[in-house]
A protein has these predicted regions:
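Second-shell residues forming the walls of enzyme active-site clefts
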Residues: 54-57, 97, 105-122, 132-134, ...
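Bacterial N-terminal signal peptides
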Residues: 10-20
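Active-site mouth loops of central-metabolism enzymes
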Residues: 68-80, 146-157, 240-254, 315-322
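Bacterial N-terminal signal peptides that target proteins for export
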Residues: 1-11
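Short acidic, glycine-rich surface-loop motifs adjacent to enzyme active sites
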Residues: 63-65, 85-104, 187-188, 263-285, ...
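Preference for extracellular/luminal or secreted protein segments
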Residues: 26-88, 300, 322-583
Length: 583
């Protein structure tokens, strides 16, 4: 279950031992959350901001601009990563931390520890597009953006964002690297896809606005990403440099519109992507390192007054012959306020500090960024209360209300792409044999396992998996099983697939799916269910019935089974054009 008792006996013992620290962060000291938009936050004078900025050394100012990453897992006080991060926080060489995978109790403990050793409060962040559980076990899991858009209900998006904010603040996290406002115009996009609200500009703006409001009205900084738009590329920037080919008119008409809307709404942070925009910059320089994109376009022309943050600096899109030191200096020169996730945060700090001290980067450039960072920390109330009360975790994390919202999003998102032969809901004997074929684009025994187990509770079930390494004997066995089946379900969790870029499926897998209708007895129901991208369903028109749930979480799986049994009518609306092209 997603919602569960998150405090084990061991965790409770840890909390008891930490009680002297927790008393400093009691509920009586809860800071009322402000709701001022970015347009006012970053313009007004503030004595705490001025005084803090005035007493920081050059080294400490540069440190404010660096956000280092750490796993949110229990660490002893001799753990190398723990010791390093503690020292960097103590010495003022980092201004924030980004949590990777872990659990809610450990995250809260680590956040409190690093805050306690840092003179200036730390800005703690995480990528929580699908909720806090995307990073931390014990929290509520939500469906991705495309599922939320398919539900067609911005109020659900706002409710989800409010829950994410409440859970995040409970463990000491202040900034969410969401929403993704990229228009997923290209079906072959390998990195955005279901992370996007779709390819329809009004829908993307509406859903993004709900997420921004839900986060920021509940005390968490929202971040629009990946400027100037990562939706029409065919390369994953984690591995290589994508190129956005559009000219300025094209970007104004499409990619830039959701960012303009978010800025007008008062979003507090924008993340710049690692992608080239040659028709704007005249080079293949990544946008995140381009003054033309970061300062001239985003800061000056768009008038954005909030925090500008790089995408993670460990991504291979940046590492084509560039050193980390060069990347960090270039990112600051471009106009970024925060350098996210440098592999060597101390090396990044040293490089930027040296660039300031030798005059390559003006100190005024650093001061501008640090002032904005401190203004955000002031808005968050971190100058008054920077520790969290872990004894209250169960009051805020994985509540019944959160579970109900997550389940409703999943149910409302299920989209019937087509049902040419009207096979849904199933009209077969409950004990009739159903064959569930799990279509993987990589080896693995876990993908689709939980759905098969749950399906087997309602039907007599045979399940098997086909991946690119499957031998011919496996395909022959699968074909034989389908011939006597009462119904066949093809399930997949593939995140990126289109007619033009057929993911990593083998030719044998593709041909098997295409030939499947001719293998079975006439009238045998065949349903293709995607727990990931909807584009794969268009790539196999031979299958007459297709459902998209957009997500592999347990609520989505439950909803699909309810559709098959006639207990749920699928009412989701497809948020993208399956044929691609401009919306």
């Amino acid at each position: 279950m997603i919602v569960r008792n998150i405090l084990s006996p061991v965790s409770l013992l840890i909390l008891f031992l930490l009680s002297p620290v927790l008393q400093q962060a009691s509920a009586r000291d809860r800071i009322p959350l402000k709701k001022a938009p970015a347009t006012s936050i970053f313009e007004k004078k503030d004595s705490w901001v001025d005084e803090t900025l005035g007493r920081l050394s050059v080294s400490e100012k540069v440190g404010q601009m660096i956000v280092a990453s750490i796993d949110a897992q229990y660490k002893s006080n001799t753990d190398k990563e723990y010791v390093l991060m503690s020292r960097l926080a103590t010495e003022g060489k980092i201004g924030g931390i980004m949590f990777l995978k872990g659990d809610v109790v450990s995250a809260g403990m680590l956040a409190n520890h690093f805050q306690s050793v840092s003179t200036v409060p730390l800005l703690v962040s995480a990528d929580m597009e699908r909720g806090l559980a995307m990073r931390l076990d014990g929290a509520t899991t939500f469906s991705p953006a495309m599922a939320i858009a398919a539900s067609g209900d911005p109020t659900l998006a706002a409710s989800m964002a409010k829950i994410i904010a409440d859970e995040a603040r409970a463990v000491g996290i202040h900034q969410n690297y969401a929403p993704t406002v990229d228009l997923n115009i290209n079906p072959a996009n390998p990195v955005i896809n279901t992370r996007s609200f779709g390819d329809r500009i009004p829908l993307v703006i509406s859903m993004s606005a709900a997420i921004i409001e839900g986060l920021q009205s509940n005390g968490v900084v929202a971040t629009a990403k990946h400027f100037p738009g990562h939706g029409d590329v065919t390369v994953d920037s984690h591995f290589a440099l994508p190129v956005l080919e559009g000219d300025r008119q094209r970007l104004d008409d499409y990619e830039l519109k959701p960012f303009r809307a978010a800025i007008s709404q008062g979003i507090m942070s924008v993340m710049v992507g690692h992608l080239a925009v040659p028709k704007l910059t005249g080079t293949l320089e990544p946008a995140s390192l381009s003054k033309t994109i970061v300062t001239d376009l985003l800061r000056d022309e768009f008038g954005f007054k909030g925090l500008i943050i790089t995408d993670a600096l460990n991504m291979k899109a940046l590492n084509d012959g560039r050193s980390l030191q060069d990347i960090c200096v270039k990112a600051v020169e471009a106009g970024n306020d925060i350098l996210l996730f440098p592999v060597d945060p101390e090396g990044a700090h040293k490089a930027v500090t040296a660039a300031v001290e030798c005059g390559t980067i003006p100190l005024s450039r650093i001061d501008d960024s640090v002032r904005r960072i401190l203004q955000v920390k002031r808005w968050l109330g971190l100058d008054r209360k920077k520790l969290v009360d872990l004894a209250q975790l169960q009051d805020h994390v994985a509540s019944q209300e959160a579970s109900e919202i997550a389940e409703k999003i999943a149910a409302d998102a299920v989209t019937l792409i087509r049902d040419r032969d009207r096979v849904l809901p199933f009209r077969i004997p409950m004990n009739g044999p159903i064959v569930d074929i799990i279509l993987n684009d990589k080896p693995g025994e876990e993908i689709g396992k939980r759905f098969a187990e749950r399906l087997g509770m309602d039907y007599a079930l045979i399940h098997l998996r086909l991946d690119p390494s499957s031998k011919e004997a496996v395909f022959k066995s699968a074909a034989e099983m389908t011939r006597g089946a009462s119904a066949i379900i093809l399930t997949t969790g593939i995140q990126a697939f289109s007619r033009s870029v057929p993911s990593k499926l083998s030719a044998r897998q593709i041909n098997f799916v295409r030939d499947l209708p001719s293998m079975v007895a006439p009238g045998t129901p065949i349903v293709f269910v995607s727990f990931g991208t909807p584009y794969i369903l268009e790539a196999f028109p031979e299958i007459g019935t297709a459902l998209c749930a957009y997500s592999e979480n347990e609520f989505s799986e439950k909803s699909v089974i309810q559709v098959m049994k006639g207990e749920l009518v699928p009412k989701g609306s497809l948020p993208v054009s399956l044929n691609g092209g401009l919306p």
